[in-house]
Amino acid sequence: MRVDLFDFDLPPENIALRPASPRDSARMLLVEGSEGALADRHVSDLPGLLRVGDCLVFNDTRVIPAQLEGRRGEARIGATLHKREGLRQWRAFVRNAKRVRTGDRIDFGAGVSAIAAERGEDGSILLDFEGDEPVELLLERAGTMPLPPYIAGKRPTDDRDRDDYQTMFAREKGAVAAPTAALHFTPRLMEALAAAGIASETLTLHVGAGTFLPVKADDTDDHRMHAEWGRIDAATADHLNAIRAAGGRVIAVGTTSLRLLESATGEDGVIRPFDGDTAIFITPGYRFRAIDGLMTNFHLPKSTLFMLVSALMGRDRMQAAYAHAIAEGYRFYSYGDSSLLLPG
């Protein structure tokens, strides 16, 4: 399909630079049924919009401070880590990468440095961090939260982002982007969901910086996704299969949860344990096997994520839903409002 079929105009004022407070006060657009009926709600309404026996699936990845600023000699170098490849090695997208040669040492300050070990075909650079201290501790000292370009380009990252850009479920360190749909959840909301008979489960998918990259191809067939590591354990898979067998719905919270669930599910509709990389790319025409609904934020024009929601609900319906959201002043992207997509 042509990538420009997934384009739309978004006014800059619709881009959120800070999250709602409290988190569950964010607005939520309900898109429901084969006709894509729309209703303006709030995230706090979620317990009344789901059914007894449904299950929400959250991504428990934890964002690391993966944005680094350093120098190679006099040249300023910016690096965004996006995938771990060894005990001390991370693949990174590097600003001013042409100034970095294999074997160069980059000083990131605070006693943190790395050697440019190799250059990848995608233009990324493999960084080999020096010293014996765990890389996670080095990043805590020298790194900042890797906010998406559409936020970082409008304001500097600050200490608030260390909390704001982390979900309440964040446990497994390794993501360089937040699973943002889950940013809306609070302990109060989780208690209300449990009281309404709605279950929850977690899986892990370490979101990579590739999620921020634009689609450069003109046709979806020519686009290649970056691989991300994920895991679903046997107990979680068994529980989700039991939920569906009993007539409940599996609702993915975020596109990362959805993509991993679909990667772990066979043609028979059975969710299986998963431990490995996925580069699944979902576009219209895909047959969903694992999920019955999706809660997700509002995505970029011509992005792989807008293609995914178009696959779930239909491109025309999602174009209409986004036009409604823009007209009604919904806040877009990582710190923005939410949508609940129930194809019916």
Curated annotation (Swiss-Prot):
GO molecular function: S-adenosylmethionine:tRNA ribosyltransferase-isomerase activity
Keyword Transferase attributed: yes
Listed pathway(s): tRNA modification; tRNA-queuosine biosynthesis
Keywords: Cytoplasm, Queuosine biosynthesis, S-adenosyl-L-methionine, Transferase
Enzyme Commission number: 2.4.99.17
Record field: catalytic activity: 7-aminomethyl-7-carbaguanosine(34) in tRNA + S-adenosyl-L-methionine = epoxyqueuosine(34) in tRNA + adenine + L-methionine + 2 H(+)
Alphabetized Gene3D superfamilies for the sequence: QueA-like
InterPro entries: QueA (IPR003699), QueA_dom1 (IPR042118), QueA_dom2 (IPR042119), QueA_sf (IPR036100)
Any single Gene Ontology cellular-component annotation: cytoplasm
Compartments where found: Cytoplasm
Cytoplasm keyword on record: yes
Biological process, per Gene Ontology: queuosine biosynthetic process; tRNA wobble guanine modification
Assembly description: Monomer.
Family: Belongs to the QueA family.
PANTHER family referenced in this protein's UniProt entry, alphabetically: S-ADENOSYLMETHIONINE:TRNA RIBOSYLTRANSFERASE-ISOMERASE (PTHR30307:SF0)
Free-text function comment from the UniProt entry: Transfers and isomerizes the ribose moiety from AdoMet to the 7-aminomethyl group of 7-deazaguanine (preQ1-tRNA) to give epoxyqueuosine (oQ-tRNA).
Protein name per UniProt: S-adenosylmethionine:tRNA ribosyltransferase-isomerase
Naturally occurring in which organism (per UniProt): Rhizorhabdus wittichii (strain DSM 6014 / CCUG 31198 / JCM 15750 / NBRC 105917 / EY 4224 / RW1) (Sphingomonas wittichii)
